[in-house]
Amino acid sequence: RGLPVDVASFHRRNMMRNVLKDGLALEQDSGLNPFRPGFIGSTDTHTATSGGAMEKNYVGHLGSRDATFRNLQDHFVSNPGGLAVVWAEENRRDAIFEAMRRRETYATSGTRPIVRFFAGDYDENLCESTDALEQAYAAGVPMGGVLERSDDDAAPRFFISAQRDQGTDLYPANPLERIQIIKGWVDDAG
């Protein structure tokens, strides 16, 4: 059970980044990308703790079988659970489902950061603008969207907004350390 786990030991299909890259390769060959998922997270516990994704309050996955402190620490692949974040215009069923169809979603586990990600042809001063989100939508695509190649084949600019989880009085949140962007592409080598 040695920790940390070597990521290279996982099958390549265990990483969504590889599935996304395979979709790009299929699109290059056939014009169709069957792998354009939106991402959400959720818990799969059997303890009636939906939304209970804080590590400090983790009560286990199966209740009586892993209820001891030792058993809670025994499985490196377990965590308190995931959460789905959906960027809908309003908190109504139809607006939420429309945002899910747009794939304007993300998954998180444990903490509850507020993240926005856009790509497009942006001015380099976008971050200083008071209407940055409006400009981001107007000149690009949000997370989950399909980014078309620009006429001049220029690389897109990213606009990212991330706010840390506010935490609670009992469990204050830590500052964000970094944002990691994993880039995938297809070239002549595949």
Identify the role of each PLM range.
Residues 1-190:
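C-terminal functional module detector
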